[in-house]
């Protein structure tokens, strides 16, 4: 067993390294045998989409969807996309994410609540050719998502109506398309039935801003945050994201088609050494023959020497569910299965299931899906009745966050990949799909499977909005979504709503469709308490557990607990005019902060000023990164300390509020909307590394956290303290034995010498029993006394003005560039050659315009180097991002900037 865990540990480290150097992963959902009708505009697809306001033409759908219909007066359209996205692209309206352009009082972009639904009701149209290879087959048109209702016309024929944002529709267009010729597709898209008003209501979730406008947006099954929320625009998105927001594709099958394959795993306990697999798939006979069809479905688990088949008859128009059970097919009992594990707990083993259906020996259709074998359960058998999760029988401490979708659905594979790669780098292990958002893409779930990220899925109801008025529509959207995502091992938990209730029948439907995952009615029940804090507080309050006005929140399972970070100065310059940046224009900054919700122009600014008053936006933004780093580090490390049974109180999980920025905002998180990381990403990644030494600003103690399912004995943690002149004034070490998935709390106490400088620094080093450094950590601290939660005082919060007295340091930098496939790497080695600490250094990868190349992936950033210390960092980006040149920059608090032209 000892050799096994050593091997597992090595595998985990190798996997972690490979994850962070594997760019441009293929989107497996993009079947190359399909015709994908992506627009030329924005998506670089092959199809010219056009759009026109429905009220601006009197032509009927029959005419608009004819192949010779003139569209010279129509506008280019973005598909997938929304009406407003296309109107902004065509310069009909200004960029909503800039300054106060979107502010309803600015009257630059009409709000649907004021101009009515017809204003944003649009026709979308394109033409496509059906290849000769489709001749004699059934041709299908698949629409993955339209918001909110739609008429689908092909060659003059109304073939379908779509209702609800999360429905996948499959339309048999065989009798209506022309093989080898141009065909016309026209989709008339209607906005949500009840757009709601951005005016606040008198009711809502306790202690929060007036989110969700007047609440009526909730009468629809849609993306509820479009009417306004405090983490985005409080006055919402003007068209409520009306449009064809997901892909449209065309494919062909034989007489019989397959859809919605599902594979269920039942693991034998307690050893989890055997899996019983149950496979099911829907078989669709869309032929017009009255005689029915004899067909055969064959299946295999690829590479495992497991195959199975079944013959049966499907009558005209029948949609038959065919099931293969392990009782009927013993080969579906798998011994010693390779289990799937989340971040840090084991490898992300995945299998492929392939199914075909044939008639008279000729294959009509095939489907393939990936799956993982694992069991995820939870219970409330804890000291405080809080919910705790288990993976494959082992307890899992949740270090999660709340995923927020892009506000205007400006999605791309590049954005999805970058955000999930940053997520994996951060060490987070679960993403909550917050109930006012969306159900994410197949590519999103594919990457979560590969990266070991668990997903908590909610279903589009919140406590700030009313409930859907059409229950059948809501339930059909839930059904469509569950069938789409249920094979993903990353999908861990179902929750009906955010801070609300459930639609009657939801748990029964989920059990019928899946039955392998846990469920709770809403996000704050059944062992999950209510959240907070949400905005800036004194970082000392996290250690004291007084950060929330609702009382203790560092305990049990907290679904929403977080703090903001200022974006970097380059990004701030992209979101508003220079005159609004400095001095800070409170109106503009507050609008880009959910009407000031996160206190960026008040408390955040006050705390930044504790590093010394700034004279420019550049100086303010640099200091703002220091505060953002402390915000993230203090939250994660206090939860580390209280992990499960090891701290002052029982904690089973935290979901940081919130994960990603839905639009440009001055209150960002680990990265901003433009995919440029902040200091919070790297300080979160440090805090959530699997073996981690950390300092408590309130207790002055050092603890060591272990996130692996194995113990580590005879490790050594060392604490060093340096004064403002970089003299080492304290050093002490302690031996630590790290329990499996546990914490060695208060391993040593730092005794700060009398007369130590007002500002000083702490370096923590963790070494294994052979003396090899495993991890390190770095803090800045002041002598200020913490005077309580109503103040902005304390050694993590105030008294940092003397940082300006840091003497100059020198860092020697060397780099090498290399190319692998489509990717470009810069391998950087740095060494502090001076006797002074090089404080808070930032590497930048810039283009010729001195703008950050995005997305780029840095293995570390915003770091400090003690005298003589060495560090290596690798930066990676796609080669296609280098068309405007590339420059490497190193800058820091007390070093001279260095610039190197790379291309």
Model feature map: region roles:
Residues 281-288, 585-861, 865-875, 884-888:
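Carbohydrate-binding surfaces of carbohydrate-active enzymes
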Residues 430-596, 610-613, 623-637, 641-653, ...:
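Substrate-binding/catalytic cleft of secreted carbohydrate-active enzymes
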Residues 24-35, 52-56, 86, 114-258, ...:
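Accessory beta-strand-rich segments of carbohydrate-active enzymes
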Residues 178-182, 282-381:
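Extended acidic/polar, glycine-enriched regions
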Residues 23-142, 223-247, 251-256, 380-381, ...:
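Extended carbohydrate-recognition surfaces in non-catalytic/accessory domains of CAZymes
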Residues 85-130, 134-142, 148-155, 160-161, ...:
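Active-site-adjacent substrate/metal-binding segments within catalytic domains
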Residues 134-137, 177-181, 195-196, 330-350, ...:
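Short glycine/proline/serine/threonine-rich loop/turn segments at secondary-structure transition edges
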Residues 1-26:
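Bacterial Sec-dependent N-terminal signal peptides
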């Amino acid at each position: 067993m000892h050799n096994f865990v050593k091997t597992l540990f090595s595998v985990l480290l190798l996997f972690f390294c490979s994850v962070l150097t594997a760019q441009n992963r293929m989107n497996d959902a993009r079947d190359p045998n399909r015709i994908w009708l992506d627009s030329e505009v924005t998506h670089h697809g092959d199809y010219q989409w056009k759009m026109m306001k429905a009220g601006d033409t009197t032509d009927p759908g029959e005419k608009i969807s004819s192949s010779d219909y003139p569209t010279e007066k129509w506008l280019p359209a973005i598909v997938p996309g929304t009406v407003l996205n296309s109107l902004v692209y065509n310069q009909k309206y200004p960029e909503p994410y800039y300054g106060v352009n979107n502010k309803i009082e600015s009257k630059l972009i009409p709000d649907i609540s004021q101009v009515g639904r017809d204003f944003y009701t649009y026709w979308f149209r394109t033409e496509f050719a059906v290849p000769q290879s489709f001749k004699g087959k059934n041709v299908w048109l698949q629409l993955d998502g339209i918001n909110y209702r739609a008429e689908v016309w092909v060659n003059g024929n109304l073939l379908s109506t779509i209702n609800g944002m999360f429905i996948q529709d499959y339309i048999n267009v065989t009798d209506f398309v022309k093989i080898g010729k141009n065909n016309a597709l026209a989709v008339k898209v209607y906005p949500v039935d009840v757009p709601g008003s951005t005016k606040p209501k008198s009711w809502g979730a306790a202690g929060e801003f007036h989110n969700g406008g007047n609440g009526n947006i909730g009468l629809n099954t849609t993306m509820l945050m479009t009417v306004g929320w405090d983490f985005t625009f409080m006055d919402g998105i003007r068209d409520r994201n009306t449009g064809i927001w997901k892909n449209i594709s065309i494919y062909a099958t034989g007489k019989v088609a397959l859809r919605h394959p599902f594979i269920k795993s039942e693991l034998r306990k307690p050893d989890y050494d055997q899996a019983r697999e149950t496979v099911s798939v829907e078989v669709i006979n869309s032929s017009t023959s009255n005689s029915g069809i004899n067909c055969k479905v064959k299946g295999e688990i690829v590479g495992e020497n497991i195959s199975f088949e079944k013959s049966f008859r499907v009558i005209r128009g029948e949609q038959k569910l065919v099931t293969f059970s392990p009782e009927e097919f013993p080969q579906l009992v798998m011994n010693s299965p390779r289990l799937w594990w989340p971040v840090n707990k084991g490898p992300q083993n995945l299998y492929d299931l392939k199914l075909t259906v044939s008639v008279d020996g000729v294959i009509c259709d095939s489907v393939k899906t990936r799956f993982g074998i694992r069991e995820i359960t939870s219970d409330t058998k804890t000291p405080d009745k809080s919910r705790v999760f288990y993976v494959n029988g082992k307890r899992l401490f949740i270090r999660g966050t709340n995923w927020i979708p892009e506000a205007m659905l400006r999605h791309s594979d590049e954005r999805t990949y970058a955000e999930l790669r940053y997520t994996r780098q951060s060490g987070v292990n679960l993403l909550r799909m917050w109930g006012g958002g969306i159900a994410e893409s197949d590519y999103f779930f594919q990457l979560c499977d590969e990266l070991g990220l668990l997903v908590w899925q909610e279903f589009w109801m919140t406590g700030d909005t009313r409930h859907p008025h059409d229950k059948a529509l809501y339930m059909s959207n839930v059904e469509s979504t569950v069938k789409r995502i249920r094979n993903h091992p990353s999908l861990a938990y179902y929750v009906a709503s955010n801070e609300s209730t459930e639609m009657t029948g939801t748990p029964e439907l989920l059990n019928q469709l899946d039955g392998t995952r846990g469920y709770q009615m809403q996000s704050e029940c059944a062992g999950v308490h209510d959240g907070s804090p949400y905005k800036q507080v004194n970082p000392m309050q996290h250690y004291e557990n007084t950060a929330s006005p609702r009382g203790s929140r560092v305990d049990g399972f907290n679904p929403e607990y977080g703090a903001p970070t200022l974006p970097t100065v380059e990004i701030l310059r992209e979101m508003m005019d220079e005159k609004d940046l400095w001095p800070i224009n409170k109106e503009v900054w507050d609008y880009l902060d959910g009407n000031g919700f996160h206190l960026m122009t008040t408390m955040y600014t006050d705390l930044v000023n504790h590093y010394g008053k700034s004279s420019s936006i550049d100086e303010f933004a640099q200091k703002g990164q220091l505060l953002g780093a402390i915000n993230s580090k203090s939250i994660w490390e206090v939860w580390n300390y209280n992990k499960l049974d090891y701290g002052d109180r029982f904690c089973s999980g935290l979901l940081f509020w919130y994960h990603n920025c839905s639009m440009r905002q001055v209150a960002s998180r680990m990265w901003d909307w433009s995919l440029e990381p902040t200091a919070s990403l790297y300080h979160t990644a440090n805090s959530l590394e699997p073996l981690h030494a950390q300092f408590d600003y309130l207790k002055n103690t050092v603890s060591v956290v272990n996130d692996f399912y194995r113990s580590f004995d005879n490790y050594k943690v060392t604490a060093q303290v340096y004064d403002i002149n970089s003299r080492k004034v304290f050093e002490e070490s302690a031996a630590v034995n790290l329990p499996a998935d546990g914490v060695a709390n208060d391993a040593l106490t730092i005794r700060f010498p009398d007369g130590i400088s007002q500002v000083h620094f702490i370096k923590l080093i963790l070494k294994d029993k052979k003396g090899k450094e495993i991890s390190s950590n770095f803090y800045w601290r002041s002598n200020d006394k913490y005077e309580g939660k109503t103040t902005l005082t304390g050694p993590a919060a105030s008294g940092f003005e003397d940082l300006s007295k840091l003497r100059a340091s020198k860092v020697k930098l060397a780099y090498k560039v290399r190319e692998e496939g489509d990717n470009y790497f810069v391998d950087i080695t740095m060494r502090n050659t001076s006797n002074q600490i090089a404080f808070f250094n930032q590497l930048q990868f810039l283009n010729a315009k001195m703008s950050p190349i995005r997305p780029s992936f840095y293995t570390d950033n915003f770091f400090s180097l003690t005298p003589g210390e060495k560090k290596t960092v690798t930066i990676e980006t796609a080669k296609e991002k280098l068309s405007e040149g590339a420059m490497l920059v190193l800058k820091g608090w007390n070093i001279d900037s260095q610039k190197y032209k790379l291309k």
